């Protein structure tokens, strides 16, 4: 059970913000967007805030949410050397992205075995944590949309409409398919190399593009769409107990 009964977790990613509401240990609803559409019936006792955005953008979001819920306790989550039974691999632990840290914490508590954590969003993030809770490190690679956007922004004549991206068999026979499927192949190759080394580990996946990409990999895995929010709840609740 949470230290506080009603909890709002804010996961501010690079391109979208995810709001997850908890009542004790139950997820009530999840909302995505650049701003919070207030649920007048839900007033959180506490807000756990995790952001990979700049200090300036994080401060603006903080101010907006605090205006909506002036009486709610606010906790900003940061990456640490040790928390929730997990040891951070980084020599400068605060430099590990908070989204990665929360994913590792949640995966360790869910699996309790050697685990690979994959978050497929703006970037593809992979972290490895052993059954003792030792974070072994990980990787960051461009996500599918980022790869496509980078290619289009750095070339003069690779152009197509989104409507041209349609599934087909065999080698791509259009620019749209060549780019889309080429980026998928790069991402799959990256993940397949990691799988060759860690195929005996449990794989836990999250993120908006996880389903479409990892279904092609043929890996036995556990899907957890709210993994980062679960990690935020674990870390925030631990900090709340320690500060009582």
Task: Label the predicted regions.
Residues 1-83:
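N-terminal glycine/serine-rich phosphate-binding loop of ATP-dependent small-molecule kinases
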Residues 26, 44-47, 71-72, 91-93, ...:
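Active-site regions of enzymes building and remodeling cell-envelope glycoconjugates
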Residues 76-117, 123-124, 135-136, 171:
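Active-site neighborhood for divalent-cation/phosphate handling
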